[in-house]
Amino acid sequence: MKIVAPVMPRNVEEAQSIDVSKYQDVNLIEWRADFLPKEDIVSVAPAIFEKFAGREIIFTLRTSQEGGHITLSDQEYVDLIKEINAIYNPDYIDFEYFSHKAVFHEMLDFPNLVLSYHNFDETPENLMEAFSEMTKLAPRVVKIAVMPQSEQDVLDLMNYTRGFKTLNPEQEFATMSMGKLGRLSRLAGDVVGSSWTFVSLDQASAPGQVSLADMKRILHVLESED
């Protein structure tokens, strides 16, 4: 299971002052560009990609529709993604499938999509249908993050992940049940078939994230042969 940590600068000065040594035990860097004004994203990008040269980067524009900090039309959203990709070709690009389905056809040539769905209110009853629709599109990664209202919601998310991974062994999944109630799902990825777990360093990018230090300790125990 790969560890993903976010970088969330709010201006170019913060981007330039990122301490990359804090990320040495992280497998993937997620640049949450939505913490910037939309007109600053392209100008801040060089600082991010230079800081993390040689590291795998996920470019994410988490919009307000899915718990993020930026509001964009469908066309603004896809145009920004295309601009960053054309210049920097990040290893992964997050695409909010259900929020921007109208422009998904413009992303069909992208081989490195993280097709994502976030629901900060609930674990929807149609979660299995969401898994199915996104998996059929065969992106690089299917990412699903939902908020549980009960222990059963957490177990449902984990069971669906395991089921779809079993049926689609070549497909990568990154799934999590958010908040304190859902923390178990962030720790048990290897058991259910979730390839990534998202951790926090100085600031969490989603509720229920475990700190990098704690995650390293937990994974050490879980992966130990003794």
Swiss-Prot record:
Q: Which SUPFAM superfamilies match?
A: Aldolase
Q: Which UniProt keywords apply?
A: Amino-acid biosynthesis, Aromatic amino acid biosynthesis, Lyase, Schiff base
Q: In which pathway does it act?
A: Metabolic intermediate biosynthesis; chorismate biosynthesis; chorismate from D-erythrose 4-phosphate and phosphoenolpyruvate: step 3/7
* Catalytic activity, as annotated: 3-dehydroquinate = 3-dehydroshikimate + H2O
GO molecular function list: 3-dehydroquinate dehydratase activity
List positions binding 3-dehydroquinate. E30, W31, R32, R62, R186, S205, Q209
> By its UniProt entry, which Pfam families does this protein fall under?
DHquinase_I (PF01487)
Q: Which InterPro entries match?
A: Aldolase_TIM, DHquinase_I, Type-I_3-dehydroquinase
The record's EC number reads 4.2.1.10
Q: Name one GO biological process term.
A: amino acid biosynthetic process
Q: Catalytic center at which residues? A: H118 (proton donor/acceptor), K143 (schiff-base intermediate with substrate)
Its biological function? Involved in the third step of the chorismate pathway, which leads to the biosynthesis of aromatic amino acids. Catalyzes the cis-dehydration of 3-dehydroquinate (DHQ) and introduces the first double bond of the aromatic ring to yield 3-dehydroshikimate.
Alphabetized NCBIfam families for the sequence: aroD
- Known PANTHER family for this protein? 3-DEHYDROQUINATE DEHYDRATASE
Q: How does it assemble?
A: Homodimer.
The record's comment on protein family reads: Belongs to the type-I 3-dehydroquinase family.
Protein name stated in the entry: 3-dehydroquinate dehydratase
Q: Which organism is the protein's source? A: Streptococcus equi subsp. equi (strain 4047)
